[in-house]
Every structure is written in C-alpha cells, then in structure tokens.
UniProtKB/Swiss-Prot annotation:
GO molecular function: mRNA binding; poly-pyrimidine tract binding; pre-mRNA 3'-splice site binding; pre-mRNA branch point binding
Record region (Disordered): 36-169
Biased composition (Basic and acidic residues): 42-55, 94-109, 125-141, 155-169
Gene: MUD2
Lineage: Eukaryota, Fungi, Dikarya, Ascomycota, Saccharomycotina
Domain RRM: start-end pairs: 424-511
Keyword Phosphoprotein assigned: yes
Species the sequence originates in: Saccharomyces cerevisiae (strain ATCC 204508 / S288c) (Baker's yeast)
CDD domains named in the record: RRM3_U2AF65
Listed InterPro entries: Nucleotide-bd_a/b_plait_sf (IPR012677), RBD_domain_sf (IPR035979), RRM_dom_euk (IPR003954)
Protein's recorded name: Splicing factor MUD2
Annotated SMART domains: RRM_1
Amino acid sequence: MADEKRLEDLRSKIMESIGKSEKDVVPIENKRFNTDNAVIDTHFKRQKSDGELPKAPKSRNVSHSNNRGPSSIITMSTNRTTYEQTRAGPHRQSYRDASGRSYNRENRYSSHNTGPQWNNNPYNRQRDERRGRNERFDRRGRNGNGNYDRFNYQRKNEGSKFNGDRDKRQLQTNKYDMNYNSQNVMYPGSSFDSPAYYNMASSKANSRLVISGLSQSSDPSIVARLKDLLENFISGLQKTESNAEDFKISNFYIGEGRPDHIIVEFSSQICSTMVLACRSFFNAKLGTFDLKWRRPNDYVQQLDHLVDFCRGTVIALENLENIGEGEDYRMKELFSSLNVTNGTAKPLFYKCSSNTNNTGKESEFTKCILLSFEVVTQDILDKLKPYKWFKPNDGKISQVTSWITFQSLPNLVTQSVRVESRVLLLLNCLDPLDLKDETFITEIKETLKYSIAGADTIKICQPGVDYRLNFENLASGAGNIYIKFKTLEAAKHAMEELPGTQFNDRTVLCTYIDEDDFDMMEATQLS
C-alpha cells in the first residue's frame, strides 16, 4: 500500500508539472504542434539559420559553394586559396571574384577608392605576376642598366623604324646650334632627345649682336647701309653653307634710349658668330672704324663641345692682308702652320650685290677666317701672335648644357653665377595663352606691384598672334615677367624671398638680368 501511494503522488506531481508547462507556452508557438502541414512548413523555413542557405560569399576571398553547412564553405574556401597560392607561386598571388576578374589582395584598397582595384588585363597577368617571371629582358645587364638593355638595343638598331631617317629628323632643327657633350653624343645611348637638347641650348642672347658707335659717324644713312650689308652677307651664306636655309635677320632695331646702339637678332648662333667674325670687313665697307661689335652682357658661353663653330674655343682671324683673293696656297700654308685641317677652318666670303659689283665677281673674300680647336693651348696662342684675332664666342657667363637635367636643377639654380642688378626675371609664373586677355595682364601687373616692395617697372613678354605651346615658340620667352626695382637692395631682398613661392598656382623661379641689356633691348619689346 505504501508503494502504491508513492506511485500516485509521483503521478500527480508529473501531471501538475505537465499542466504548468502547457500554460507557459505562447499561443503562436502552439502552431508547432498543429497538424496543418502549411503552418509547419512556413515556420520551419522561418527558423532555418543563414548558414544552411545557399548564398554568395560575404567577402571576395570566400568562394561560392552550394553546400548548406558552414563548415563545408570554409573548407572549400581554404582549399581553393591554397590551390591558387600553389599555382601562382610566392610572387603571383592574384585572386578572382565570382565574375572571373582578378585583383591583388594585398593592394586592393587605396586612399581614393573603397573598393578593390580591378585589372581588366585580357591576359590576366598582374604586376606581381610579371615581377615574378624571370624573363630574359628583365635581367640586369653587365653595365648595371637594369631592365633597359632591351630598349637600348632597340634605340640603336631599330630607331629608323619609329622616327624615320636621322637626317630628316635633324632638318627640323639647326645643326649648327646642336650641342654635344664630351662623349660627342647628345645623350648616352640615344639620339631621340636631340630636339630637347637643342631647345635647352638655344637662346635669344646667344643670337644677338650689339653694334655701338653710330653717333660718331657723319653718314646719316649708315644704319640703312649696315642693314643692306648684313642682308647680302647672309644671303651669300645661304648659298655657300650647308644647312643654312634658315639663316636670316630676325630683328633689327635701335636700342631704347641709346640712339647710337643697334641690336641685330639672327635666327641662329652660328649666323651671329660668322657676322661677328667679319666685323673688320663691315667697318671697312662702311668707311668707319669707330663701330664696336660685341655680344650682349647676358650672353652665355657654351662649354660643351659644340658642332662646328659654336664652341667657346673658336678663334676668328681678321685683316689677313697677306692672303689675297684666289691665293689658296697661302691659305693652305696658314692652316698647316697652325695644324688646322680643312674641316675646322672656314674662310668667310661676302656675296656682292648687283649695285656695288664693279669687278664682276660674285663673291669677295672678307679676309676673315674662323678656326675651330678642340683645346686652345699655349702653343696655338704663340703661333697666332703674328695675326690679329679674337674669340667671337667668349663670354663672362658660361655653362655646360649637358649638365642640365631634372636631377641637377635644384643644385644649378642655387649657384650664383650672375652679377646682382636691379632687374629680376620671374619664370614659370604665367600661362602664355592667358596673356591674350588684356584684363588679365592688367590684374597681374597690379598684383605684383602691390605685393612686391620696391618694384619700379613691370614688363611682361606677351605671345604673338600665332603663338602655340610648342618648342618652336620656346625662345620667344612668352610669359616671362621682368621687374626693375628702385634700388639694388630691394632687388636683393626680392631675390631672397620670391624663389620657391607660389604665384598663380605655380612655383616662382628668379634670376638676375643685366640692367643695360634690359633698358636697351627688352624694354622696347615688352609691354
């Protein structure tokens, strides 16, 4: 009986506990025990976890899988990543997304883009892949040129396929003004950069001559006669000299405030050198010996080994009275005594015009000869003592053009090679195409006048009507700003403050300009 009571008590407790559990169940949850299949299926789909559903990968590093188990997805992703790394190697770890595009996992984010940097290379070769390949042309050469052996080979042997004949390329520039370095090449292993080297060597100051002493002549037509002599001489050079088709007088004017000074600008430096070498001949033709011929003060002597007669070691012989017209044997004796070959000696002749040609000869020997030496030694100077000579390309300022590179510019601009003056030249301040607007020019001048202390005169070089942004118009100096200060101290202070500052969103570069040259030449040509 006692056992039966215990069983009854236990059964009653179980029934009470079952009743309490049924009261605590939420009514919607009772649908789980409903026999309606629709309700059971709907709730069953709602209760499934995300890991059991087929889905796209949460990140691009997880591959797509149809397995519903999360463990299988991780296993498949790990296996595929391991396979790609094994296939690509240590340097070719590129990956693909679901669309088949490849990307680099290490460099897929940047500061500008929040997404990966896609590479639509049709061959699907990434930069890291190419670096990992031991290609024949990627190896470092014997001379340490890195990966450029292939391109040096192409430049030397296949240059004509891409740039045409070399002579045709050089016809675009003047061969006489082409500068060479000590290795007799414009750039090591390349002739493609010859136009760039020519543009760095060309200069207006190197093509100008200043003729003074006109006021001492009693002939009122001396200026017109001088211009006719120069034009006839240049026309004769065009017929006798090779590559002289572009020889001409670019500008001929009287200096501002200097009525006894004439400035003659030629198209090239070699043309100005030949004219300067014949100064004694022109003085004799004009019937006066008071004219003085010289280079501008801003003339820069090129220390490089220049082609033909543009180097600083050129010597001009003048007033050779012992060598007459047609006496070639005397000229050969002179050359042999100086150890000069025919290629480095140039006798200069003047083409006679029809009005002044009384002898019937087409040309007249000027009694002037240009001699080109590699180095002017003391032995050569001793042999030149019996003759009257001078150096037409000699100047106070000199430079080595082959040293001008982007890497050497920071050091070159800090060198003090020019004499301090009251005139500063500001470079890289303006876009030449913006200077066709007169209102903009006025605003620039007013801004400079009130922002730079001690400025007296401001001149801006404006472009011509047909100006274009190309190398042909580089020598015109469009966009350059000339500022003349009231005192030398103000110019020095501006030279210390202006270089490196920002003007018109550009970095300002400054240099001194000779004051006499500015007043005589630039002031009349600028606005």
